[in-house]
Amino acid sequence: AGHTLAANGRYLTYDGKPFFPVSGEFHFARYRREDWERELRKMKAGGVNIVATYIFWIHHEEEKGVFDFSGQRDLRAFVELCGKVGLGVILRIGPWCHGECRNGGFPDWIQFQTDFARRTDDPTYLFYVRRWFCEMEKQVHGLLFGDGGPVIGVQIENEYRSYAEPDREKRKAH
């Protein structure tokens, strides 16, 4: 705790000193957990000071209602390790992520539902998204920058409306 991240009229500051953020991607669930620290230290040695990471829904709720944050899927352990190594974290939480992941990161059970529209304000879709976001919040509780943790930002959604859609009007509600 006690760190400050701010902006003045010309640049960002970290603890009152000029700060130039350099971000790199590391998709933790795609790496063996035992490799995380070595790879993060390589990133830091290369000048990266912020790690952006997708949290692919499909990796954590393969079966509807059954969440898995164990092993290489352990979001909390990954974020804590980033802090230990001295890296800030940007969580890219989706719900749709892309990241060259099947279904854009949607679990199959979401992708192939026919009773609600994905990536819209459909109440059923938003019910599942809210439940997913609440599960992620449990994992990172206390690790946000304001709490003294390394999480300095959160990206919601990804590449929205950046691809051809057959029914754009339905998607405007999102």
What is each stretch, according to the model?
Residues 1-50, 80, 84, 88:
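N-terminal carbohydrate-binding accessory modules
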Residues 7, 62-64, 140:
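Residue-level signal for pocket-adjacent positions within structured domains
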Residues 22, 60-61, 118-119:
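A short, mixed-charge helix-start or loop-turn motif at secondary-structure junctions
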Residues 36-104, 108-110:
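Aromatic-lined substrate-binding rim segments of carbohydrate-active enzymes
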